[in-house]
Design a protein with these regions (language model features):
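Conserved two-component signaling phosphotransfer/partner-docking surface
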Residues: 92-94
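A short beta-strand-turn-helix
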Residues: 4-20
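Short pre-active-site segment immediately N-terminal to redox-active cysteine/selenocysteine motifs
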Residues: 19, 26-29, 71
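Typically the conserved alpha-helix immediately C-terminal to a functionally engaged Cys/Sec
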Residues: 34-46
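A short, hydrophobic beta-strand/beta-hairpin element that forms part of a small beta-sheet core
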Residues: 73-86
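Hydrophobic beta-strand anchors of alpha/beta hydrolase catalytic cores
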Residues: 22-23, 52, 75
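Conserved small/polar residues in nucleotide/adenosyl-binding loops
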Residues: 30, 98-99
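Thiol-based oxidoreductase modules, predominantly thioredoxin-like and allied folds used
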Residues: 6, 41, 48-61
Length: 100
């Protein structure tokens, strides 16, 4: 599966409707966010049991604010609708695989 785009309007539906969801909160001006994007695509394709959802913080500030996001990129891992882990900054693929 490829990554999916989510918004403030539908992110909760995605989180609640799937067992494992990794929400990548990013921005188009964020260099580390852009560097992380292909790694997240690989994680999504190699782990069909994990939904990798990308949320543009500039267009959707509500979710970032609700989860207290202070820096980008921030990845939030949800299991059965509950936040279970948080990663900040550009992460190597092994860290993302361990989290998911």
């Amino acid at each position: 599966m490829s990554t999916i785009k989510v918004t403030d309007a539908d992110v909760q539906e995605t989180i609640q409707g799937n067992d494992l969801v990794l929400v990548d909160i990013w921005a188009p001006w964020c260099g580390p966010c852009l560097a992380l994007a292909p790694v997240l695509e690989e994680v999504a394709k190699e782990n069909p049991n994990v939904v990798v959802a990308k949320l543009n913080q500039d267009e959707n500030p509500g979710t970032a604010q609700n989860y207290g996001v202070m820096g980008l990129p921030t990845m939030l891992l949800f299991k059965n609708g509950e936040l279970v882990d948080r990663l900040m900054g550009n992460q190597p693929k092994p860290c993302l695989l361990y989290t998911s």
